[in-house]
Amino acid sequence: MHSRCLFLAALICSLSLRAEIKAPQPEFKEYLVAPVRVHLLVTKGELNLTTTLEEKDITRIFEKVNRIWGHAGIHLPVEQLIKEPAENPNAYRQNYQSRNLRWLLALRPKTSRADSWFHVYYLKRFGVNGVYIGRNGMFVKDTARLRGVKDGMDEPIPRVTAHELGHAFTLKHRQSVTNLMASGTSGWTLNEAEIKQARTAAGKIKWISPAGEILKEADALHKQGKKKEAAALYRRIAGIPLHCPETARAKKRADR
């Protein structure tokens, strides 16, 4: 009986550390849209360089990422999902114990690199949960583990992904345990100063556009009968976590 009570107490405590991310408040017109190219590294004979994440996992992960970043009025649609082998597996074998993680850049396949978009690479294992090396080099391991905090996220990978994207928006670590930029916790919140800083940084990146501009361009293409081109733009904004006429129209036309 005593052990059962302890188990139930531990379970209740565990559940109390997890909470659904609150719904974002910004209106549609406030959103800035920053496309992401996701790379799933799957390398034959290299278990550490082979993620077991699938497309359905990425969909779930980025739904949570966007619920976090929605509080800053920033949306991060997965523009492209690529499954590919690491470019240089030897870089892992030679450097996996190194504290300098820039060697991870050597894993990026040359054919899928691009200056536009954010690039997030998923693999199985390396020394930390995730690392931001540049807009075109963010790395997250699918075995990430975090320290639970009150009202924190229920899953590590979306939180680690959102954290590294925070660095892409120039945010630094802030060791308030419930904060997104704290190290190693399940916290996901942003304060007003961080939101302002992230939006200012996003506004300076030429390939990040306001949602309203994307919708206007998509509507124009749709009116011209260019349904395929319009659908690509509608998909970019359809996942914004709002129930409004703009997202409803985008969702309806995104599959055409």
Where would I find each of the regions flagged by the language model?
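Active-site-proximal segment of zinc-dependent metalloprotease catalytic domains
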Residues: 28, 106-174
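Hydrophobic h-region of N-terminal signal peptides that target proteins for export
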Residues: 10-18
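Propeptide-to-catalytic entry region of secreted or membrane-anchored zinc metalloproteases
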Residues: 20-114, 124-126, 234, 241
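Structural recognition of the beta-strand scaffold that forms the well-ordered cores
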Residues: 38, 78, 119-122, 139-140, ...
